[in-house]
Design a protein with these regions (language model features):
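Active-site-proximal alpha/beta segments of enzymes that process anionic O-linked groups
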Residues: 160-468, 571-572, 577-598
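Acidic helix/loop microenvironments that form the catalytic cleft of cell-wall polysaccharide enzymes
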Residues: 443-447, 515-523, 599-602
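Histidine-centered active-site microenvironments of extracellular/periplasmic hydrolases
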Residues: 311-315, 507-508, 512-556, 592
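Short glycine/proline-rich turn/loop motifs
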Residues: 345, 469-480, 554-561
Length: 639
């Protein structure tokens, strides 16, 4: 064996495989943790054994590594600058980014990337030639068949669990549970405490015992592709590693990521198929030759009462507060406090009470604007794929130009919203005379201290520089709130820059900003934070409209109506209708009474997701968390 390793060709090949396997451990060189490194290492070892056992010699499996070689520069780049490897989101960006956009994004690092790619290609070719020439590393003895048998057995066990599910870990007997979790009476006798179970303890203990099973010990359902009704795999046969360990491994884990990407694309296509043939038959009511730009900014996790524009004592909007043509809307609510559910209601005619249902049979205002002769842009600092993002991406794909610019996700390596400014400038300068630009910002998404540069870290103490703070830890309440307010300060700067761009030149311009939902922030004695709750802090969102002087001269009645309705009861359901009215776009079946910029405007019943569909304007506010509680009976929800 040592003689084989002493030969340079063999050593070069083995070191190549070792280097590829070491890619997931790159973050550890920078002092960053890797989740379950031993699991990843074990999975990689099994994967290499499987490849060698099945193909017998490196020359016959080396070609499988071509995707890994090609992906290596991107993987190292993402780990270096964003602290994460290639994901379905990154694959989506690569698939939808033109070479020109890629060059603009890489900037001065493009030559470094090209050099790295040439180096890797040289490495790939030379290692492949080496694998073809050497026969020293062939697996020829009988141990190969033993390995194949063991792999086949493991694959069979995995297939059984995948198809028929995995049984749950046995629950502790009720008698034992009674001693631990049943309702008890504490009786003080002779200076000691004795425990006596209540009469109703048994059923309660059984329920508690079942509920106490951790997620890792619960039953896992099978996919049921065969239709057979076999018993689930016994718990003892469950593989000792999670499937994520394979996805995080290299180089064979790329297969899993590619498959996830394929599933997301397929899911995206299925959602898009529901409205593929839909049309609004939209047109501009009074078209003219004047160039115009309409910008729609979708905010993230922003709270109405943390904007000084809305009366907050801290000056979080020093720049927007100086804009004479800005009309702040004081009573806008979102129906659901989750981005993937709230944004579709905002950008389409999807009713609030249908927001929990996936997909929608109609397209968004992007298509209506396109039909009316506008070139449309979707510029996003959010994620394109995933459970929480794909429903929004379905609508984003309607745009003529789509750019997802955040390679870092929501981590500490994510981009600030200012990354949207350069592509916005390009969109405004585009030769098309009429343009709609949607900016989907990262706003005040957790972790708050990662949403702004250091110079905006105004209120102290803050979370700035704190590694992985837990928002569930109420002891960081002051830091959490201070950092949150700094996100609003940065949002003010970002939006002021957007407006500043719209003021330049002689185009007719207008902008609408609406946040998708708010945040609860351990308010007073409330022990809740983040979002996904039924609190007024999360339903009441900041919103405003800004217009240029040229816009006001063209549409004085719209501007007058806007100012008149600044205190009207509004919801994100009004956004679609108002944004089309803002662009003077008409279509058959339109509901002008839903546009707060039109004289026909009427307030409508506003529903929010609170113990069913609660009538927001017929509800009480409960406790310091300000839960919205319907005075009547909430409507039943359908999902």
């Amino acid at each position: 064996m040592l003689a084989v390793l002493r030969r340079p060709a063999n050593l070069y090949l083995l070191l190549t495989y070792l280097a590829l396997s070491a890619v997931p451990f790159v973050p550890m060189l920078a002092g960053k943790p890797l989740g379950r490194p031993w699991h990843v290492l074990g999975v990689e070892f099994v994967a290499w054994v499987a490849a060698w056992a099945i193909f017998k010699r490196p020359a016959w499996f080396h070609w499988l590594l071509i995707p890994a070689f090609l992906a290596l520069p991107a993987e190292v780049y993402l780990y270096t600058y964003y602290g994460q490897g290639i994901s379905t989101h990154h694959l989506g960006i690569i698939a939808e980014t033109s070479p020109k956009e890629a060059m603009e994004f890489l900037g001065s690092t493009v030559y470094l990337m090209l050099g790295a790619m040439l180096t890797v290609l040289t490495w790939m070719v030379t290692s492949f030639v080496t694998a073809r020439r050497t026969r020293d590393l062939d697996w020829n003895d009988s141990s190969r068949w033993v390995a194949l048998a063991a792999l086949a057995l493991g694959a069979g066990v995995w297939a059984w669990g995948y198809e028929f599910g995995i049984a749950a870990k046995p629950v502790a007997p009720v008698a034992a549970a009674l001693k631990k979790v049943a309702a008890v009476h504490l009786v003080k006798a002779e200076g000691k405490l004795s425990v006596a179970p209540s009469a109703s303890s048994a059923p309660a203990a059984k329920g508690v015992a079942q509920a106490s099973i951790s997620k890792a010990d619960r039953a896992v359902p099978g996919v049921g592709l065969t239709g057979l009704k076999w018993a689930p795999l016994p718990r003892v046969g469950r593989l000792p590693v999670e499937f994520d360990a394979f996805a995080n491994s290299w180089p064979f884990g790329l297969v899993s990521r590619s498959y996830d990407f394929y599933k997301e694309r397929k899911h995206l296509a299925a959602l898009g198929a529901r409205n593929r043939n839909f049309t609004f038959h939209a047109r501009q009511a009074r078209p003219d030759a004047k160039a115009e730009v309409v910008v729609m900014v979708i905010g993230e996790s922003s709270r109405y009462d943390r904007w000084s524009l809305n009366g907050y004592e801290r000056e979080t909007n020093p720049l927007l507060g100086k804009e004479a043509n800005l009309v702040a809307l004081s009573d806008v609510i979102t129906s659901v406090s989750a981005t993937r559910l709230s944004v579709p209601v905002m950008i389409s005619r999807k009713p609030a009470t249908h927001s929990l249902k996936e997909g929608f049979a109609e397209k968004s205002f992007l298509t209506a604007y396109k039909e009316a002769g506008f070139k449309t842009f979707w510029l996003s600092n959010q994620i394109s794929f995933g459970e929480y993002d794909t429903p929004v991406s379905v609508f984003a794909k309607e745009a003529d130009v789509i750019q997802f610019l955040n390679l870092g996700g929501f981590t500490d390596n994510s981009n600030f919203d200012q990354i949207l400014l350069a592509p916005l400038r390009s969109a405004i300068a585009d030769q098309a005379p009429k343009k709609l630009v949607v900016l989907h910002s990262l706003g005040s998404h957790w972790n708050y201290s990662h949403r702004y540069p250091k110079q905006f870290d105004r209120w102290k103490p803050s979370l700035y520089g704190v590694d992985k703070p837990a928002y569930t830890n109420i002891s960081i309440k002051p830091q959490l709130n201070n950092s949150y307010d700094s996100t609003i300060l940065y949002t003010d700067w970002f939006l002021a820059n957007v407006i500043g761009m719209l003021k330049q030149g002689d185009q007719r311009t207008a902008l609408m900003y609406v946040a998708d939902h708010g945040q609860t922030l351990y308010d007073n004695t409330c022990d809740l934070a983040f979002h996904g709750h039924n609190t007024q802090f999360e339903f009441h969102v900041p919103a405003f409209v800004w217009y240029s002087d040229l816009y006001a001269a063209r549409h004085p009645l719209k501007v007058a109506q806007l100012r008149q309705q600044r205190k009207a009861r509004l919801s994100t359901e009004n956004v679609f209708h108002t944004l089309l009215d803002l662009g003077d776009i008409r279509y058959p079946g339109e509901k002008l009474e839903w546009s707060f910029m039109h004289p026909q405007f009427k307030e409508h019943k506003r529903y929010v997701d609170s113990y069913g569909w609660t009538n927001y304007d017929n509800a009480t506010v409960r406790g310091d968390c300000r839960e919205i509680i319907d005075k009547g009976k909430p409507l039943k929800q359908e999902k």
